[in-house]
C-alpha cells in the first residue's frame, strides 16, 4: 500500500501519520476539527512533542495531506480509525465517535480497502458494531469485498525513549485474510507485529494492559493511605521493594488517575462483562479507590492548612502541574481539575502553574476553567499563596525554589524528597 487515510489527528493519529510518512507511505489525515486542519496545513503542531519542522516538511512535500472531507479517502487503500472512546456519566461506553466515523467512511470505501480500528474498546466492538455499519454503508461484505482489523494504539506521550516504530503492534483480523492485509500494511512502519487470533482477542489485550495499571495503581494508593496512618513513607517502601530483581514491578501513588486510557478503559470491560453475567469486582474496586484519591488529597490539604491556623475556605491555593502526567501538555481527565473543582467548592481561591499548559483550552468537561492562564513562576506570585499543591511531577519545575518561596507544600508526587525545606511545611500526600 502506498496511500492510506488516518481518521483522528490527535495524540494517536498524528504520530502514526508521521511514522507512515517516514516509511514512504503517503497519508491523508482526516479530522472533524477545522482548527487542527488549519494548524497542520500551516505546519503548526498542537501537540507539544510533535515536531513542527517534520509536519511542515511532510505537508510541503504532499506526503501528508489533511482535510475534513471524508470523500477524499476513496482514493486511498486503507483507513485507520483513531478517534476517542470516552465513557458516559454512568461509566457506560460511548462509541459515538467510532460509529459516526464508520458512517462517514462507509460510502467512500473502494473495493479491497482495509479498515482498521485503533481506538480502545470492549471485546466485540469491531465485529458487532463497526462491521455492520461498514457493510450497510458500502453495500459490500467484510472479509470478501473489503478487509477489517483491530490494532490498539500504544502511545506513551512524554517518554523520549518511546518511538512509534519500536512499540510492538498487536492486531487481530475479522478473517485470516484481513489479518494478513493488516500485517502487510503495518509492517511497513512498525518493527514488530504481534498477531492474535481475532479482533476480540486484540481488543481484550488492550483492556488487560490498562486494567493492569489501574489495579496496581489502586493498590499503592490504598497502601499509601494505610502507611500514612502508620507514619511510614510509601515512596521509601516502594523504592526499597523495587530492588528485588524478580516478582515485583514498581507502581506509584498519586492524586488520582488521568489521561484518556487508565481512568476510562477498565469500565468498558465491566460494562461488557455484564452481558455475559460476569461481575468484575476487583476492577470496579480499583476504580473506586483511584476515583477517591482526590478526596484524600483534599483532606491532607486541610490538615496542612490547619497546622498554619488556616482553613481551606478563604485560602489561596496554587496547583503545581495540571497535565495528567509529567512532561506533557495533555490535560485530558487530569485529576488536577478534580482538585481545583473541590478546592473551589470549599471556598478556596485556586490558581495553577504548568509550564506545558500556559492557558486552559476549551473543553466540554471543564468549560468553566477555559481561558484561565498559568501564573508566572516568580517569587512575588508564588509567595502570595497559602499552600502549593504538587499534582504533576514536571522535570522543568524548580522544586527547591518552590520550597523556598512557599510556607506550605502538599506533595503528591515525592518531588520534594531530599530537598531542604526548613522554612516550609511539607506534607507528602
Show where each model-derived region lies.
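Structural/interface elements that position substrates and couple domains in central-metabolism enzymes
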Residues: 1-429
